[in-house]
Every structure is written in C-alpha cells, then in structure tokens.
Amino acid sequence: MTARRCPIALAAALGISAAFAATAAAQAPALSSAMAPAPLSARLSADAPPVQVAPRAPGAKTMLLKYGPMTIKPGQNLIAVDLLKERPAVDGWITGFRPGMIRVKDAASPPVSQLHLHHAVWLVDWVPTFASGEEKTWIDASPGYAWKYTTRQHWLLNHMIHNLTPTPDQVYLTMEIDFIPADAPEAQGIKEITTRWMDVQGLKPYPVFDVKRGAGKNGKYVYPDDAPDAYKGAPRVRNRWVVDHDATLVGTIGHVHPGGLNTDLWLERGGKKVNLFRSDAHYFDPAGPISWDVGMTVTRPEWKVAVKKGDVMSVTTTYETRRGAWYEVMGIMPVGITKTPDGGVDPFTGQVDRRGVLSHGRLPENIDSGGKPNPGLSNPLRLRDGPYVDRIVIKNFAFDQGDLSRSSRAGRPAVVARGKSLLFVNRDPELTVFHTITGCKAPCNKTAGIGFPLADGAPFDSGELGYGPVVNLDSLIKDSDDERVPITAAAQRTTWRTPKNLNRGTYTYFCRVHPFMRGAFRVK
C-alpha cells in the first residue's frame, strides 16, 4: 500500500502522509498461513494469570489488514495520523482484534529494543475504537456482541513508532480482525457495542505524565490520586466520564508503560464508589516491571456490568517508584459498552467477577536483551577529567564531550563548576530527531535495551529536545476539552540546562529515545 497526501484539514495542518480511502473500501485479504503472525509462547510462571484465548465467533472470518509500508527513519519518534485504505469491502461486524507490527523485508515482528510500537489507535469517525501498545493485547467481544462496521465509516490510524537505532527500517502495522458480513445468517441478533475510551489524561494525541522516583506511598504511585495538581487548569477532571445512557459494560483492558503495575476502573453512584476491574501488568521477565516484556489482564467473557445514566466512571493507574523514575507514561482502559441496557450485574448490589486473564502468552519480540557488559562504552568513574565547558552539543546521535562511546579526549567527562550549569543543545534535525538528557546510575555503561538504562540516577530529565506541531482538538474529537495540544512528544525547545544545585561528583546520563547514547559530566 502506498501513501498519498491526506486531504483532510488536520493532515494538511500537520503535514502528515496518509493512504486515502475513497468511498468504496478496498477488499482486505483473508488471513493465510503465510501472513499469520509467528506463534506465541505460552510458557508462563507459576504465578501468572491464565491465558484464555477466545474462540472465533460463529460465522466470522479472519482477515489481516495492513497499513504501510512505512519507512521509520533513524531515531524517529513521531506521531502521525493516517487514513486507512485496506478495510473490509462490505458492511458487517467486528468480533475480534489482534494488533501487530511486522518488518517489510521478512514479515517478522522486530525486537522492541530496535523498533518500538509506542502506540497505535484505530479511530472510527474520530472515535478511538481499537488500540495497541507494545504488549499487543488481543481484544475479543463477548459472545453475542460486536463492533458495527460500515464502508461509509472514516477509519484513521494514530500511530507512534520509535526507531531506537541510527539506521532506517520499513514496517507494516497490522490489524487481524474476525469479521462477520452483515448479510450472513450469523449476523442476525448481534448486539452492537462501542468503545468508551477511559484515559487518566483524557482524549489527547499524546496522553502522558511523569512518575518521579520515590513518589507516592510504599513504593507505589497512583495517578491521579497522588498528584493533587494533575488537572490544574483543565476545564474538567480528565479521568472521569459521566455515563450518558443506561447501558451494559461488556469488557475492558488496561495499558501501562514499563514501571506500570495496573489500571483500575471505578464507578460512583449516590456517594458510593466500587471497583469494576483491575487490569494487572504481568511481567514475564524475572527482572520485573522495567521492560515491555509484559501482558495485561483482560476481563473474562462473562464480565457484564449494568450502569445507569448519571453514574460516574473513572480510571486510575499505579506505577512502582523504587526502581527508577518513569517519564512519559500512560494509564488507559478502553471499555466496551452497549447502546441500550442488556442486563449485567449491578455493582452496588451484586458481585462483579473481577478475575482477569491474559489474552496471549509471552511475545518473543518483547524479550529484553539489555544490561549486558558492553566493551564499547567506557566507565566514566575511571576516566580523567575532561575540559571545563559550558555547553554540550548533540549531533549525529553523539555528545561532543563526555560521550562514553568515544575513546579520545572527547570521551572524558565534561567538567562544570559547582553552582553552575551545563547547557545541552540538540543539533540533530529538530523536527524529527528528539533527544533527552536523563540521569542514570553510574557507570551506566551496559548494553542498551528497554530495561537498561533506567532513570535511576540523579533526578534530572530534559524532556524530548525538539519541536513539533500543535493542534486544536476541541473541534475535531468528541469529548476532547483541549484547545491546543502538541501532536508529538517534543518539548518545544532544543536546549536544556542541568540543575545548578548538583553536588560534587560524576553524573551519567542517557537518551530515553535512543538508549545507546550515553554521556557523563563532573561537578567540581
């Protein structure tokens, strides 16, 4: 599939590419063995939740839809919105959804330490409906329910793919769906559900927040509960939704980033508040919550909750805070909801089945390989002082002084006098290559992965140095309350200064976007 210029106003404003879907949707191919994803490992630890793969709904056919090919440039960390062309050619019902990302050259899922699917959100008529992070949770409607599909719908894809390497690559984003044509006998009696998007940051293109090391209580930080100013200046509390019709909730899942422990869905009525479901992050790696080697628990097929108009639904998320700080993280819980009431447990008088299951086993591409000895990086604690400097320039994915990958004088830690600060300047393409200066524990010189380095050193972080567009969402997305928000992770600046109150010593840092980049400076 090739990409053409997106004719809609948002795309024109952002300068993004798109594959335009004409009024007639393209025929999507049925899934063949050659196109099927690699088998998933089901090797789980003894304490893991059970894996429960939902059977395909009667009459459903599995189709693999692809978007691309997309060229992911070296160091890329951008958000784009594209129109989707490859879709079912007839009206019908979607009963299952399995996301993925594959390389063009070999149809294999790339290791997360090389190409990272930060997020992909499939929007139907501007409403977030299906989504994926690196954990790639499978989504299946409970028996008898489905998402309605028509060829008249506008389907868009909001996606963000990190290239953690200095070399380009090409990928497809994939969406494997179970689809029942509207005229099939099995389509009779299907009950329509839609997706209610619950996010601790509300509806934003980049809905993130930061978790500081040591924040919260007993090594855990609950957002927004532990952030009194979480929504300061916002017109409403972003993590809440007032239910606008009597309905039945029929499923939900959670999404967190490394460091995340769970998400919680809550319901309030008449001064009472109950928990509807906790989506737990199960980390397959024994190292725990420091990587994308994770699966999120989902509700069981029998989970049904009756809600009433005027109820208040909300979402919270919990992160650990002993291992490190966690920057630009998320807490999201999409919820399947009916258009009319269809039974279910009243959570204030009955018992909701809150037991969760995993939708799949361990994903080979998410197994982390970082944290091993790396002879290509120096130990800055053993190096002599470099020169006194007042600035460090970042260019070609390297620091001009104190870069641990350099063996020359330029590899020695830059020196700054106590009470002064160092200025970091990003001289890589400021609209496409963003860098951070994030403190890590010295010597911070092992191989890069997702679980290494961590933000476990001095508590400083520059944000992503670079520039990106902003957009008025209020007129584009239903229920958005943002007038002007950034579309990318860029901090809207290319410079940052170290804190002036750092004590004497050697400080190591890395780039969160490109973790192979390491540097050091000394305060004397």
Describe each region flagged by the PLM.
Residues 373-524:
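Extracytoplasmic copper-binding redox domains, predominantly the cupredoxin/blue-copper superfamily
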Residues 4, 260-264, 445, 518-521:
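Short amphipathic alpha-helical segments with coiled-coil-like heptad repeat character
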Residues 18-35:
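C-terminal region of N-terminal signal peptides and the immediate post-cleavage residues
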Residues 31-248, 253-372:
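Beta-strand-centric surfaces of beta-sandwich/beta-rich domains
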Residues 1-11:
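Bacterial N-terminal signal peptides that target proteins for export
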Residues 9-21:
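Bacterial N-terminal signal peptides
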